[in-house]
Amino acid sequence: MTSSESTATDSPRKGLTAALESSQPRRRSFTDYRRFIQNHYDGLPGALTAVTGLLTGHEALAGRLIRPGAFDVRGCKRILDAACGNGRYSRFLLRHADADAILTTFDLSPRMLTRARARLKSERVSHAVADLTRLPYADASFDAIVCGWVLEHLPDPRLGLRELARVLQPGGKLLLLSTEDTLTGAMCSRLWHCRTYNRVELRQISAECGLRWEREMWFSGMHRLLKLGGIIVEMRRASLPDSHSA
């Protein structure tokens, strides 16, 4: 299966949430869709992520996920912020990581990387334009990874999860955030032209890719109660994924 033409293999969506979801991922080939998404984030929608993050509370809530007692990166020396966007999670990684830790970031959108550089202004960070399905890093390069709100831009999550598992060292930790197949998730899908994932199915697929769910996390107790905020989970790399698995 190639990243350019692969299609989703999970269960078909039904009902109101399916009707509300963006049709862009289904209407376009992956090559065309990837170009569309890059242009989307290079443009005004990407520039507005700083504003929308404030309005939705995601800017402040990000700090509740990346900190001691939550996704703790103390002791991690090589950290990757996958599809870093405007640097929302990078700034908390820098705040809580050891002083000698190195942060690597990438994004498909060159303009988002420019915004992240302007925001972070740190010599401890390196930036690169890269594709989650073809990461330019060696096996087991990182002991911690944050991957926020990018997996839903792939037709099949395995394309990204296998690469994340490959570059994560055995026992390394991954914080994954992804849009869920709920009503609010479908509304976000329409806004950002992405798909959604079912929580149970994504857990099973993660295991196929060598990633073991450790714990599900939430922005707040209210998010947990109302099942809001999407899928947020801390995982560990168990072993090398089988490239021939389904």
Question: Where do the language-model regions lie?
Answer:
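Conserved class I S-adenosyl-L-methionine
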Residues: 5-72, 88, 92, 112-115
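Short catalytic micro-motifs in class I SAM-dependent methyltransferases
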Residues: 149-150
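Acceptor-substrate binding/catalytic loop of class I
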Residues: 186-201
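Conserved S-adenosyl-L-methionine
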Residues: 211-222
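Conserved beta-strand signature within the Rossmann-like core of class I S-adenosyl-L-methionine
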Residues: 172-178
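Class I SAM-dependent methyltransferase SAM/SAH-binding core
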Residues: 80-82, 86-134
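A short glycine-rich, Lys/Arg-flanked "PGG" loop and its adjoining helix->strand segment in the class I
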Residues: 158-170
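A conserved beta-strand element that flanks and buttresses the S-adenosyl-L-methionine
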Residues: 146
